[in-house]
Amino acid sequence: MDRSAQRIDFTQPADVVAPLLLGAVLRHGGVAIELTEVEAYLGTADEASHAFNGPTPRCEVMFGPPQHLYVYASYGIHRAGNLVCSPDGEAGGVLLRAGKIIEGLDIARARRGSKPADEALARGPGNLGAALGLNLDLNGSAVDQVFSGAGDSSPTSAPFTLTPRTAIPEITRGKRIGISKNADALLRFWVPGDRSVSSPRGRQLGTPLRASS
């Protein structure tokens, strides 16, 4: 269903914000990624969250103002990104698990190498982070919401822009993957059938979710 883009309220809990991000476009450094898979983490109420035990130097950004980026090192190698949500002082975040490159394909490929297929360039949190050019210096960066495809040409000083979706995609929700704690929580959301989504089991074992506007 097509509709006018609506601003996402990042003061809402992560499990509310997460499905709203599917179909939205995140831009940084000449690359635009349409988000196809995300995962919600509920702060101190979620054993799998980096924020479960309260603020630390690593995760303090999650307790700060919403609509900022929390970037962390995964396995000491990859850089993964989360969009911070919930009110200031209450930790919450949405892990950006996968997306498809819609602008800056050559730039993303230069960062990822020649081997991955186009649909795999931003498949998985670390790969998405690499394609988007994430690094730890970007931790805490503001994310501006822009509309009408303004993208990098929009008058904003923020290093990241997010264009909310203008059409509600089909959405599936299911268990989180790649973690051991609270893994059964139905807090992963994805666009069914999209080849950029985690594969193969990441595309399975979910139930349809009626997306809110």
From Swiss-Prot:
Belongs to the DNA glycosylase MPG family. Its EC number is 3.2.2.-. One of its GO terms (biological process) is base-excision repair. This is Putative 3-methyladenine DNA glycosylase. It is an enzyme of class 3 (hydrolase). It comes from the Bacteria. It comes from Corynebacterium jeikeium (strain K411). The keyword DNA repair applies. The keyword Hydrolase applies. Keywords: DNA damage, DNA repair, Hydrolase. One of its GO terms (molecular function) is DNA binding. InterPro entries: Formyl_transferase-like_C_sf, MPG, MPG_sf. SUPFAM superfamilies: FMT C-terminal domain-like.
